């Protein structure tokens, strides 16, 4: 009997080893198709009504499989893929094959979407309130009263009451998923069989610094998107809070005082509420969810530094804007170092349009760090966070539309530029509409921040003159180096520039 077992075990192992090359060959053939289908499924996942942790995990899994699919095509030199056929070389080292994945427009946009799904995964899992006490356990899902119900509002106000940061994130993720699949699909097959790539690998791109530089820039851009979702959600919910305060002023009997506690609203599931059986949604459930009693000094798991249990909105914004600033700083420094020792420009900075596209968000993120360092979420902080992400989208439009000439532009297709320009106009109009509507309802104005503080004012309150100067400098840079070229193109005094591809046979001494 033992001899029979010893004979069957090697046979099973040999059979499994025999199946491994077949499985590898099948995956090599099907990886572009699987990556394409994963991208299609990601759009349907982003279209779901509720962005729960399971849905975000599935969204992150789909983009991870898609990214590893194109990565496997580059490593195995699968020249049946058009993206690999035009951007890779079979004789390149393994490290540069991997970095060649994001050296083109399609691969870099797939990396952008993968980082966006990863940040959404962290944001959804780590920003959830944990260790909620039993007395306020259901405060996030229960109603406040029948008068605060969203069913009693009109259609426009009812739609606004359902908007939160996860819904805004879902809209951004949905756009980039559609944009990637419609105009920048990296899994396009070619109809003929080939064993050699179309283009040789550029010697300038064979640098370890350049392999790390683009992911750092993309990580900084996407981190600003999470801060944008938080700020826009805060602006929208501030209008709901003002409406709730009006109801409390006119209906004080709805306030249920408790001994030794803050007054709480008499919810529909409490004994004092006459509408305990009415299943209506709440208009102010998000504001009550922020006052949920939580245990202090608790974390969700090892990455609890991202959002602890007692973290407020301004702390989340501070963390994400610091993440954006750190990645942009590292990316700009690495790009300057690469330009200095590889391109031989004679300096660390050339004021290239692509360099300006990453420098403008860095300036705004620096101003936002000065504004968010104090535990006070004012209107100026919200405005700076929103403009930082809008500036990232604007810089991406300039780099990927082919409108401006640069040493390292990605694309010249006008269709991609139209997608990004429409998205930029849409989110800019929505953001400014809600922001200025909030400013009209607020008692303070942005211009009043320039006034000299009186002696009775709290000295810890920061004066945003420094932030305004940073923003003015950023606007000057944008006008001087970006929109000046656009004006010449519109006047017809300057023809459409072609993308400059720098090819060098050897490194400069």
UniProtKB/Swiss-Prot annotation:
GO terms for molecular function: heme binding; heme transmembrane transporter activity. The keyword Protein transport does not apply. The gene is YMF4. Belongs to the CcmF/CycK/Ccl1/NrfE/CcsA family. Keywords: Cytochrome c-type biogenesis, Mitochondrion. One of its GO terms (cellular component) is mitochondrion. It is found in: Mitochondrion. Could be involved in assembly and maturation of cytochromes c. May play a role in guidance of apocytochromes and heme groups for the covalent linkage introduced by the cytochrome-c-heme lyase. InterPro entries: Cyt_c_assembly, Cyt_c_biogenesis, Cyt_c_biogenesis_plant. GO terms for biological process: cytochrome complex assembly. This is Probable cytochrome c biosynthesis protein. It comes from Marchantia polymorpha. Signal peptide: none annotated. The keyword Mitochondrion applies.
């Amino acid at each position: 009997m033992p001899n029979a077992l010893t004979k069957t075990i090697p046979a099973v192992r040999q059979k499994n080893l025999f199946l491994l090359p077949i499985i590898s060959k099948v995956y090599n053939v099907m990886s572009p198709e699987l990556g394409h289908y994963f991208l299609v499924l990601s759009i349907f996942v982003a279209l779901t009504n509720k962005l729960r942790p399971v849905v975000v995990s599935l969204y992150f899994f789909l983009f991870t499989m898609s990214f590893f699919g194109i990565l496997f095509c580059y490593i195995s030199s699968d020249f049946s893929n058009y993206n690999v056929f035009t951007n890779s070389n079979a004789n390149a080292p393994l490290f540069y094959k991997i970095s060649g994945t994001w050296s083109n427009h399609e691969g870099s946009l797939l990396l952008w979407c993968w980082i966006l799904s990863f940040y959404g995964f962290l944001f959804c899992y780590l920003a959830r309130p944990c260790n909620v006490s039993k007395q306020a356990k259901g405060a996030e899902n229960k109603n406040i009263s029948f008068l605060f119900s969203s069913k009693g509002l009109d259609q426009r106000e009812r739609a606004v009451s359902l908007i939160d940061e996860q819904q805004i994130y879902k809209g951004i993720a949905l756009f980039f998923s559609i944009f990637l699949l419609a105009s920048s699909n990296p899994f396009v097959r070619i109809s003929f069989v080939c064993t050699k790539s179309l283009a040789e690998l550029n010697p300038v791109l064979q640098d370890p610094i350049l392999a790390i530089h683009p992911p750092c820039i993309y990580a900084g851009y996407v981190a600003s998107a999470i801060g944008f979702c938080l700020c826009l959600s805060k602006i929208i919910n501030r209008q709901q809070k003002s409406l709730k305060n009006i109801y409390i002023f006119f209906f004080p009997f709805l306030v249920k005082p408790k001994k030794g506690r803050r007054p709480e609203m008499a919810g529909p599931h409490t004994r004092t509420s006459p509408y305990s059986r009415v299943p209506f949604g709440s208009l102010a459930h998000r504001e009550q969810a922020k006052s949920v009693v939580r245990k202090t000094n608790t974390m969700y798991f090892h990455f609890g530094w991202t959002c602890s249990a007692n973290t407020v909105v301004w702390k989340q914004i501070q963390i994400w804007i610091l993440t954006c600033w750190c990645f942009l700083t590292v990316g700009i420094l690495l790009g300057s170092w690469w330009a200095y020792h590889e391109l031989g420009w004679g300096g660390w900075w050339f004021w290239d349009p692509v360099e300006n596209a990453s420098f403008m968000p860095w300036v705004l993120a620096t101003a936002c760090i000065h504004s968010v360092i104090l535990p006070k979420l004012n209107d100026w902080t919200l405005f700076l966070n929103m403009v930082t992400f809008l500036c990232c989208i604007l810089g991406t439009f300039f780099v990927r539309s082919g409108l401006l000439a640069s040493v390292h532009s990605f694309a010249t297709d006008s269709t991609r530029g139209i997608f990004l320009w429409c998205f930029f106009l849409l989110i800019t109009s929505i953001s400014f509409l809600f922001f200025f509507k909030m400013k009209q309802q607020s008692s303070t104005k942005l211009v009043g921040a320039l006034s000299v503080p009186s002696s009775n004012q709290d000295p810890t309150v920061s004066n945003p003159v420094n932030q305004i100067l940073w923003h003015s400098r950023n606007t000057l840079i944008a006008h001087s180096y970006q929109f000046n070229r656009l004006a010449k193109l519109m006047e017809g005094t300057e023809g459409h520039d072609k993308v400059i591809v720098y090819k060098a046979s050897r490194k400069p001494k």
